[in-house]
């Protein structure tokens, strides 16, 4: 931050508005609506991932309009532009999922490109789904301008009328689990159809504490979005208010000289980790928070997640493992209630600056209601689990680390024998054909950031495993990822990945594997001399996808243990 007297609220746009040499630039800006009274106003990029492909982003165009109103009212000039977004729900379980995590980098790069080429002074960044949220936050951290993030909001839960006459509250995850149940003969095709027609009743991101809601909560916790803005559903009128206030806020940040890296610090990122732990959030938060830290040039490692998780209890009884959705969190006060509970317990840093220009502690003064309700969000002294919802494992199978969502892991210890599959499709076939049995450890490899490429999510197969009724008897381990909606015994982000020669590449059918959550261990119980002999003859399968954007990505992407960032 700088002293108010030294602040230029047009730190970059003077490059296109000032002087004889910028006659042509001003001429073009006149054509989009600017005039003589606008040249001294800061130019604010209003970037959104709006599209008509997925309900997650449908209301962003409307919200961008209100954000622009807020910019105008505060004395700035908004200039709207768009970026891409990939729907994980639609892309799941097939070739399209190779592009999901890749889209995070494309979003970041595209926002940087427009903001830098057009010399915009600050930004309101709007997003509504799993990769667009971290992509926008990464862009804010990289650019280090005055920036505000605004979430689209989540959808409401649907109600499916089942063939037995009952009604069932459903989210998108129920559709994936219904596939496995139908193939296992425990659900009729009629009921699957009823679920399909009900899981997405309208616009907004998936309603549970899946990746989009996890990252929206993290954005609020780190101070990059307005207090209370993560929880309201997409259809709620509060979204309009938050959009307008976000536009006003970015202009005020410029006036005060507050930039993204004044807010995105190691301490604020640890606050975000703490909130994710308390909510039982998505494993993808590990990747995304480390990637945001990388762009902010802040040190955040896998070890930090365990250190925070040791102290922060799991409080949120939220789907996919719990009973409630984000709209329920909204009803009892939203993310500020979680943050206040953690602050009062000394588990987050109240001195961190936020986009309001105030600290976390100042923002949380006088919130109403002030405390968790005890049901949707438990009190600190009555948690669901005494430690956080995510755990980092290490061991001979994952010397570089692996991630497990312990909020829903039903056993402290699992010992079984390997069933090895190179990529997801043959493993899915094995599930749907009833070929797995209790005690199997399904190894899905060559799905890492480089090996996929793209580190695909495994929601289709975890949903099928649960739907088939073997979710508590079969363990799934992969160098790929899991959806925030995945449930059951699943461990992802295994590093080093198979294509880098990690031990996961050496596993063979029948090998004994031991996972001990209490010891944070994941081990391949095969003698090192045997593994060395296997390594001598190791041959990686050919990958037909190493062209176009996937080819570029595979050359640049780093390990999952570093957030799968590209450089």
Curated annotation (Swiss-Prot):
Keywords tagged on the record: 2Fe-2S, Amino-acid biosynthesis, Branched-chain amino acid biosynthesis, Iron, Iron-sulfur, Lyase, Magnesium, Metal-binding
Amino acids binding Mg(2+): 88, 130-131, 457
Protein's UniProt keywords contain Iron-sulfur: yes
Record's cofactor remark: Binds 1 [2Fe-2S] cluster per subunit. This cluster acts as a Lewis acid cofactor.
Active site: 483
GO biological process terms held by the UniProt record: isoleucine biosynthetic process; L-valine biosynthetic process
Binding residues for [2Fe-2S] cluster: 56, 129, 206
GO molecular function, one term: 2 iron, 2 sulfur cluster binding
InterPro entries listed in its UniProt record: DHAD_IlvD/Edd, Dihydro-acid_dehy_C, DihydroxyA_deHydtase, DiOHA_6PGluconate_deHydtase_CS, ILV_EDD_C, ILV_EDD_N, IlvD/EDD_N
Statement: the UniProt record of this protein carries the keyword Phosphoprotein: no
Enzyme class: lyase
Cofactor(s) needed by this chain: [2Fe-2S] cluster; Mg(2+)
Role: Functions in the biosynthesis of branched-chain amino acids. Catalyzes the dehydration of (2R,3R)-2,3-dihydroxy-3-methylpentanoate (2,3-dihydroxy-3-methylvalerate) into 2-oxo-3-methylpentanoate (2-oxo-3-methylvalerate) and of (2R)-2,3-dihydroxy-3-methylbutanoate (2,3-dihydroxyisovalerate) into 2-oxo-3-methylbutanoate (2-oxoisovalerate), the penultimate precursor to L-isoleucine and L-valine, respectively.
NCBIfam families referenced in this protein's UniProt entry, alphabetically: ilvD (TIGR00110), PRK00911.1 (NF002068)
Protein name, UniProt field: Dihydroxy-acid dehydratase 2
Organism phylogeny: Bacteria, Bacillati, Actinomycetota, Actinomycetes, Mycobacteriales
């Amino acid at each position: 931050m700088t002293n108010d007297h030294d602040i230029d609220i047009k730190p970059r746009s003077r490059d296109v508005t000032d002087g004889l040499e910028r006659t042509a630039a001003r001429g073009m800006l006149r054509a989009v609506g600017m005039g003589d009274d606008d040249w001294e106003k800061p130019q604010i990029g209003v970037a959104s991932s709006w599209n008509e492909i997925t309900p997650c982003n449908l209301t962003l165009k409307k919200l961008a309009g209100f954000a622009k109103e807020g910019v105008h009212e505060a004395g700035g000039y908004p200039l709207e532009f768009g970026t891409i977004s990939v729907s994980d729900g639609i892309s799941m379980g097939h070739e399209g999922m190779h592009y999901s995590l890749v889209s995070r980098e494309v979003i970041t790069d595209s926002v940087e490109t427009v903001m830098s080429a057009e010399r915009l002074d600050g930004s309101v960044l709007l997003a509504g789904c799993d990769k667009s949220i971290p992509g926008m936050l990464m862009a804010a951290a990289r650019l280090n301008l005055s920036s505000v993030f605004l979430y689209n909001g989540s959808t409401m839960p649907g109600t499916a009328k089942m063939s037995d006459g009952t009604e069932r509250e459903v989210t998108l995850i129920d559709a994936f689990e219904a596939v496995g149940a139908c193939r296992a003969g425990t659900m009729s095709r009629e009921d699957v159809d009823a679920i399909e027609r009900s899981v997405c009743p309208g616009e907004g991101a998936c309603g549970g504490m899946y990746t989009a809601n996890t990252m929206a909560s993290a954005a609020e916790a780190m101070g990059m979005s307005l207090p209370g803005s993560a929880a309201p559903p997409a259809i709620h009128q509060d979204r309009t208010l938050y959009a307008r206030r976000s536009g006003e806020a970015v202009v005020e940040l410029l006036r005060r000289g507050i930039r993204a890296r004044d807010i995105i610090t190691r301490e604020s990122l640890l606050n975000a980790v703490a909130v994710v732990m308390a909510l039982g959030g998505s494993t993808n938060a590990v990747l995304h928070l480390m990637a945001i830290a990388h762009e902010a040039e802040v040190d955040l490692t896998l070890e930090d997640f365990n250190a925070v998780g040791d102290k922060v209890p799991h409080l949120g009884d939220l789907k996919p493992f719990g009973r409630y959705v984000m709209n329920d969190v909204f009803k009892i006060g939203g993310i500020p209630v979680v943050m206040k509970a953690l602050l009062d317990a000394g588990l987050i840093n109240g001195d961190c600056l936020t986009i309001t220009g105030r600290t976390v502690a100042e923002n949380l003064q006088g919130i109403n209601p002030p405390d968790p309700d005890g049901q949707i969000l438990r009190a600190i002294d009555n948690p669901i689990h005494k430690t956080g919802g995510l755990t980092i494992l290490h061991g001979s199978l994952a010397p570089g680390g692996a991630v497990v969502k312990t909020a829903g892991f039903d056993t402290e210890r699992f010992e079984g024998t390997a069933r090895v599959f190179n990529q997801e499709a043959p493993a899915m076939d094995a599930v749907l054909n009833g070929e797995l049995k209790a005690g199997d450890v399904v190894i899905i490899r060559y799905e890492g950031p480089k090996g996929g490429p793209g580190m695909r999510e495994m929601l289709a197969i975890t949903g099928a495993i649960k739907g088939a009724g073997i979710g508590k008897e079969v363990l799934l381990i992969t160098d790929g990822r899991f959806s925030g909606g995945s449930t059951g015994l699943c461990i992802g982000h295994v590093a080093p990945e198979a294509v880098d020669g990690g031990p996961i590449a050496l596993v063979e059918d029948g090998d004994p594997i031991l996972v001990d959550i209490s010891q944070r261990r994941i081990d391949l119980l095969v003698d090192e001399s045997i593994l060395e002999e296997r390594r001598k003859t190791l041959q990686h399968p050919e990958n037909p996808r190493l062209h176009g954007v996937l080819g570029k990505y595979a050359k640049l992407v780093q390990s999952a243990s570093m957030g799968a960032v590209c450089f």
